[in-house]
C-alpha cells in the first residue's frame, strides 16, 4: 500500500475529470475535481489543501497559468505539488507557469491516461502502491 494523498484536478472537460479521478482513486488517492478555475478558487479559498494540484492551462474562464498566479499571490496552497496537465505547448506559457513554481508540465497528447497518473506520481515523489 502506497502513501495516502489528496489530489485536486482542475479542468473544464468533465469527461477528462471523471476519467482522471477514477485513475487516481485506483492508486489510493482521495480526489476532488473542479470544473474550471472559478470553482477551483472557491474550493481553495474554502480551505482545500491538496497534496497535488493538477491544472489545465486552456480553460474558458481563467486560464490555468492565471489561476496559478492568483493561487500563489493569495498563498492558497504553499505546500501542494503543482503540475500543469494540458495540451498547451506554447513555450511562453510553459515558462510563465514555471516561474510560479510548478513541479511538472505534462502535455496530455504525449501520454495515455495511466501514464499521466504514473508521471504525476513520479513528479510528486509519491509511491504507486
Model-derived regions, located:
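Helix N-cap/capping motif at the beta->alpha junctions
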Residues: 33-42, 64
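Active-site beta3 strand of CheY-like receiver
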Residues: 48-54
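As written
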Residues: 64, 98-104
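Charged docking surfaces used in two-component/phosphorelay signaling
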Residues: 18-26
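Active-site residues of response regulator receiver
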Residues: 56, 86
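Receiver (REC) domain active-site loop signature in two-component systems and cognate sites
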Residues: 59
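Short amphipathic alpha-helix used as the core "switch/output" element in two-component signaling
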Residues: 42, 65-78
